[in-house]
Amino acid sequence: MTIERTYPIFTFRWLAIHGLAVPTVFFLGSISAMQFIQR
């Protein structure tokens, strides 16, 4: 396929965005859970 050259770039971008977004959501979720447990 001809899209093989541009595909890894999109994959790296996609992994970078989700790699930052997923832990952020999990981090916020854990913080809110800790606050609920303390109260």
Swiss-Prot record:
It is found in: Plastid, Chloroplast thylakoid membrane. Pfam families: Cytochrom_B559. The chain crosses the membrane at residues 14-30. The keyword Iron-sulfur does not apply. GO terms for cellular component: chloroplast thylakoid membrane; photosystem II reaction center. Keywords: Chloroplast, Electron transport, Heme, Iron, Membrane, Metal-binding, Photosynthesis, Photosystem II, Plastid, Thylakoid, Transmembrane, Transmembrane helix, Transport. It comes from the Eukaryota. With its partner (PsbE) binds heme. PSII binds additional chlorophylls, carotenoids and specific lipids. GO terms for molecular function: electron transfer activity; heme binding; iron ion binding. Its cofactor is heme b. PROSITE patterns: CYTOCHROME_B559. GO terms for biological process: photosynthetic electron transport chain. It is a single-pass membrane protein. InterPro entries: PSII_cyt_b559_bsu, PSII_cyt_b559_CS, PSII_cyt_b559_N. Coiled coil: none annotated. Heme binds at residue 18. This b-type cytochrome is tightly associated with the reaction center of photosystem II (PSII). PSII is a light-driven water:plastoquinone oxidoreductase that uses light energy to abstract electrons from H(2)O, generating O(2) and a proton gradient subsequently used for ATP formation. It consists of a core antenna complex that captures photons, and an electron transfer chain that converts photonic excitation into a charge separation. Belongs to the PsbE/PsbF family. Heterodimer of an alpha subunit and a beta subunit. PSII is composed of 1 copy each of membrane proteins PsbA, PsbB, PsbC, PsbD, PsbE, PsbF, PsbH, PsbI, PsbJ, PsbK, PsbL, PsbM, PsbT, PsbX, PsbY, PsbZ, Psb30/Ycf12, at least 3 peripheral proteins of the oxygen-evolving complex and a large number of cofactors. It forms dimeric complexes. This is Cytochrome b559 subunit beta. It comes from Staurastrum punctulatum (Green alga). The gene is psbF.
